[in-house]
Swiss-Prot record:
Keyword Cytoplasm recorded: no
Gene assigned in the entry: fla
Name listed for the protein in its UniProt record: Flagellar filament 41 kDa core protein
Pfam families on file: Flagellin_C, Flagellin_N, Flg_bb_rod
Biased composition (Low complexity): 210-233
Biological role stated in the UniProt entry: Component of the core of the flagella.
Chain segments annotated as transmembrane: none
Keyword terms of this UniProt record: Bacterial flagellum, Periplasm
């Protein structure tokens, strides 16, 4: 029997340290809910879960961008609906004025209402806003950059001769819909004030190429302001004071109604696409969160079992240390 080195106590102390460390880790997992709390717990798992978490955060912001863009389009479409109602009333008046049974004085009265309705179209276009962004007018599209990033979309006037005839001004709504830099879609929105609805031939076509003008930002596009080329000369007023003018104005009004209807159809199609994107994004987020939880989260039942085991082993090791420390005392009995 030796007394300088109590091997039994040393062995029990070493095992007690191991059990205490394991118990501490298990308690940390139980308190945090995570299986991986630091890279040493699972280096590969930490790396994979970090990338998955970044993708989840990016997709979550993209989903919020999409929701805001849908709200934006719904607001725009609602204002276009009001403009269309006014145009339909103007068409009624133009048809009425074209009737030969009315005198010039009667047509003058009709013209007064026409002018009030054109003012109403301009009022709707000027006051149609979303987060201080003018949706249906020719006003400057420069906005606060931070606001644009939060919305994930930014309006801007564009100079696209290939996409316009007449003098229609427009801007592009660009929405960041994915977790990566290049995942953005855009739609053109044409101004719906009198100057644009009744200018030149009034025809419009879809944009032929993506807008590249401006600086790409995270979640937003900040295009530089520009103007559409004018090919139709001075804007023509809506005049129904004579039969000839009424017929001419009727053609313009019908063309304006067609423009508004086409714009609403385009926005409706774009909204449907955004809703589909949002659904697929939410589904992707759900799957990624499941993968993240599988890698990162702790299985509570397993950790409770491990904590109980390590607690018992720690207490047992402490008891063994106490007993091992009693062995050298037996040497004293030999000296008596």
């Amino acid at each position: 029997m030796i007394i300088n080195h109590n091997t039994s106590a040393i062995n029990a102390s070493r095992n007690n340290g191991i059990n205490a460390a394991n118990l501490s880790k298990t308690q940390e997992k139980l308190s945090s809910g995570y299986r991986i709390n630091r890279a040493s717990d699972d280096a590969a798992g930490m790396g994979v879960s970090g990338k998955i978490n970044a993708q989840i955060r990016g997709l979550s912001q993209a989903s919020r961008n999409t929701s805001k863009a849908i709200n934006f389009i719904q607001t725009t479409e609602g204002n276009l609906n009001e403009v269309e109602k006014v145009l339909v009333r103007m068409k009624e008046l133009a048809v009425q004025s074209g009737n030969g049974t009315y005198s010039d004085a009667d047509r003058g009265s009709i013209q007064i209402e026409i002018e009030q309705l054109t003012d109403e179209i301009n009022r709707i276009a000027d006051q149609a806003q979303y987060n201080q962004m003018h949706m249906l007018s020719n006003k400057s599209a420069s906005q606060n950059v931070r606001t644009a990033e939060e919305l994930g979309m930014q309006p801007a006037k564009i100079n696209t001769p290939a996409s316009l005839s007449g003098s229609q001004a427009s801007w592009t709504l660009r929405v960041h819909v994915g977790a990566n830099q290049d995942e953005a879609i855009a739609v053109n929105i044409y101004a719906a004030n009198v100057a644009n609805l009744f200018s030149g031939e009034g025809a419009q076509t879809a944009q032929a190429a993506p807008v590249q003008e401006g600086v790409q930002q995270e979640g937003a596009q900040q295009p530089a302001p520009a103007t559409a080329p004018s090919q139709g000369g001075v804007n023509s007023p809506v005049n129904v004071t004579t039969t000839v003018d009424a017929n001419t104005s009727l053609a313009k009004i019908e063309n304006a109604i067609r423009m508004i209807s086409d714009q609403r159809a385009n926005l409706g199609a774009f909204q449907n696409r955004l809703e589909s994107i949002k659904d697929s994004t939410e589904y992707a987020i759900e799957n990624l969160k499941a993968s993240y939880a599988q890698i990162k989260d702790a299985t509570m039942t397993d950790e409770v079992v491990a904590a109980t085991t390590n607690s018992i082993l720690t207490q047992s090791a402490m008891a063994m240390i106490a007993q091992a420390n009693q062995v050298p005392q037996y040497v004293l009995s030999l000296l008596r």
